[in-house]
Design a protein with these regions (language model features):
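Acyl-donor (CoA/ACP) binding surface of acyl/acetyltransferases
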Residues: 1-33, 65-168
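Secondary-structure boundary/capping residues
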Residues: 40, 59-62, 125
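Conserved GNAT-fold acetyl-CoA-binding loop/helix
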Residues: 30-52
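Juxtamembrane helix-loop transition sites at the ends of transmembrane segments
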Residues: 45, 51-54, 124, 163-165
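A short hydrophobic/aromatic micro-motif that marks alpha-helical segments and, especially, helix-coil
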Residues: 14, 42-44, 57
Length: 168
C-alpha cells in the first residue's frame, strides 16, 4: 500500500468510495481549460477511472496516480507519474478548485517526487503544462524543476504553447 504523509496531507491509493470527490474535483473551470481529459462528467466515469488506476498499483508501467487527502480526510486532488517515451516519466498533479491557493500542490509534489522516482528507478522526471498555466508552472519551479523548453508542442492531442520542465 502506498502511503505518504506530510505536515498537512496524506497521499495514498484510490478506493472506490472516492469517486464522488474525484468527480467533483474535476469539474472546475481550470481543469476543463488545462487538462480536459481529466474531467469526469459523472460519478460513474470517475469510478471507472479509479478502477483502472487501482489496477496499476502493483507494477511500474503506469500511470501511477494517487489521491491527495487533507488530514481531516477531504480529497483535494491527486499526484501522478505518467510514462512518456523511452523510459521517461512525467509528473502531474491537480488540486480541485475549492482547495487551490493553499500550497497543497507544492507540498504534495515535493513529498511525492523522491518517493516515486526511487520506486521507478529514475533520476530525472519531466513536468509539462500549457504555458499560460501559471499556477502549475509556479508549483514546478518551487519543487526544483528547471525550464527545458517553451513553445509549440503537443498537449493532450492538440498543438498548444507548452512549458516543459525537468527535475534531475
Amino acid at each position: 500500500m502506498f502511503l505518504l504523509e506530510t505536515e498537512r496531507l496524506t497521499i495514498t491509493e484510490f478506493t472506490p468510495d472516492m469517486a464522488q470527490a474525484v468527480h467533483m474535483n474535476s469539474l472546475d473551470e481550470d481543469t476543463r481549460r488545462f487538462v480536459p481529459d481529466e474531467v469526469f462528467e459523472t460519478v460513474e466515469d470517475a469510478a471507472d477511472t479509479i478502477d483502472f488506476l487501482t489496477s496499476q498499483y502493483g507494477g511500474t508501467e503506469g500511470p501511477l496516480v494517487y489521491p491527495v487527502l487533507t488530514k481531516d480526510g477531504a480529497n483535494v486532488g491527486y499526484v501522478q507519474a505518467v510514462p512518456l517515451d523511452e523510459g521517461q516519466w512525467e509528473v502531474g498533479y491537480h488540486i480541485g478548485g475549492a482547495y487551490t491557493k493553499r500550497g497543497y500542490a507544492t507540498e504534495a509534489v515535493s513529498a511525492f517526487l523522491p518517493v516515486i522516482m526511487q520506486k521507478l528507478g529514475i533520476d530525472k522526471i519531466s513536468g509539462i503544462c500549457v504555458s499560460e498555466n501559471l499556477a502549475s508552472r509556479r508549483v514546478m519551479e518551487k519543487c526544483g524543476f528547471r525550464l527545458e523548453y517553451e513553445g509549440e508542442g503537443e498537449y493532450q492531442g492538440e498543438k498548444r504553447n507548452i512549458a516543459r520542465y525537468v527535475k534531475e
